């Protein structure tokens, strides 16, 4: 790991050194762009989540590029629920510390921990809905860009946007319902959870 970090530093440079950015002399005349370090999709290649986050934590000017298809494949289908995404980004927050992320998303066919090729999202066991749910509920702290890698590029880009919008709408509806319930419970002098139970019992009796 230290060898990879040192090599990235060697190429990209260190702004505290006199001869910084030797490979990119134009940097002296403008603000340097971020360099994305992407997770790889095969077991024998460098580029696990841990390795990528470690480099981005140590090398200024780099940003993690989390390829969800690759992560899902290397983890033998690890991204299945919103909690799986929460665990991934909690790990990123603890190790990397930043809030800027680029994410690639597409369906993926995988075998023995290796990504074989991208597919349409609907034809893969990697579903976007849990990711959309996580982003809607807990993603406000991130500056995130999601890039469609699907063979149906524009179609699946719109598919992802629609599911994210639906997840946001569901969250707003839940919050509005909880606020209404809390207000009614306060008026009746009871606990909101008690009112929720009464509402569920009334709905079941209908």
Each PLM stretch: what is its role?
Residues 30-35, 60-62, 97-101, 140-144:
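Short, well-ordered coil/turn segments that N-cap beta-strands
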Residues 183-206:
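Intrinsic disorder/low-complexity signal
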Residues 46, 72-143:
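Gly/Pro-rich active-site loop or hairpin
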Residues 67, 146:
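Conserved, mostly hydrophobic/aromatic
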Residues 1-66:
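Active-site acidic/histidine proton-transfer and metal-coordination neighborhood
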Residues 2, 6, 18-21, 25, ...:
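Amphipathic, non-transmembrane alpha-helical secondary structure
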Residues 39-43, 68-72, 107-109, 152-154:
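Active-site-proximal loop/turn and secondary-structure-junction residues that shape catalytic pockets
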């Amino acid at each position: 790991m230290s060898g990879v970090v040192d090599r990235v530093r060697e190429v990209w440079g260190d702004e505290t050194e006199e001869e910084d950015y030797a490979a990119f002399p134009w940097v002296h005349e403008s603000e340097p762009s971020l360099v994305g370090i992407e997770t790889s999709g095969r077991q024998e290649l460098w580029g696990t989540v841990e390795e990528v986050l470690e480099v981005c934590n140590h090398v200024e000017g780099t940003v993690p590029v989390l390829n969800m298809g690759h992560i899902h494949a290397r983890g033998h289908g690890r991204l299945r629920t919103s909690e799986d995404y929460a665990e991934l980004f909690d790990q990123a927050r603890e190790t990397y510390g930043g809030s800027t992320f680029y994410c690639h998303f597409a369906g993926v066919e995988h075998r023995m921990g290796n990504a074989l090729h991208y597919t349409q999202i609907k034809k893969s066991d990697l579903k976007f809905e849990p990711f959309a749910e996580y982003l809607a509920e807990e993603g406000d702290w991130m500056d995130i860009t999601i890039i469609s890698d699907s063979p149906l590029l524009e179609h699946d880009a719109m598919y992802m946007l629609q599911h994210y919008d639906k997840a946001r709408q569901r969250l707003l509806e839940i919050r509005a319902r909880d606020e209404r319930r809390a207000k009614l419970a306060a008026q009746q002098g009871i606990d909101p959870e008690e009112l929720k139970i009464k509402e569920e019992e009334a709905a079941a009796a209908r």
